[in-house]
From Swiss-Prot:
It comes from the Bacteria. It holds the Pfam family UPF0223. InterPro entries: BH2638-like_sf, UPF0223. Belongs to the UPF0223 family. This is UPF0223 protein BCG9842_B1176. Gene3D superfamilies: BH2638-like (1.10.220.80).
Length: 89
């Protein structure tokens, strides 16, 4: 995809890499499918970096505007899927 991920320049380089991996996992959930544990593990790390619900919603909105993919919908779907199953939207 040719778009710029929403990033906060206050994040460290390591945190930015983690956030980009999370965005890529959301894309994968929409495009091919991703194992639930992989997605939820990246989401937990994302929440360590972005603990605020308001900030998470802001990032989700920005990400959805550039990619067309919803972080919220992907995570809700992952919570519905059994362990070791593929999350596909």
């Amino acid at each position: 995809m040719e778009y710029q991920y929403p990033l906060d320049y206050d994040w460290s380089n390591e945190e930015m890499v983690t956030i980009v991996k999370f965005y890529e996992a959301i894309e994968k959930a929409y495009e091919k499918g991703i194992i639930r544990e992989e997605l939820m593990g990246l989401y937990r790390r994302f929440k360590e970096i972005v603990p605020s619900k308001a900030e998470e919603k802001k990032i989700d909105k920005e990400f959805q505007e550039v990619s067309g993919y919803s972080i919220y919908r992907a995570i809700q779907r992952a919570k519905e899927v059994e362990e070791q199953k593929v999350v596909k939207i």
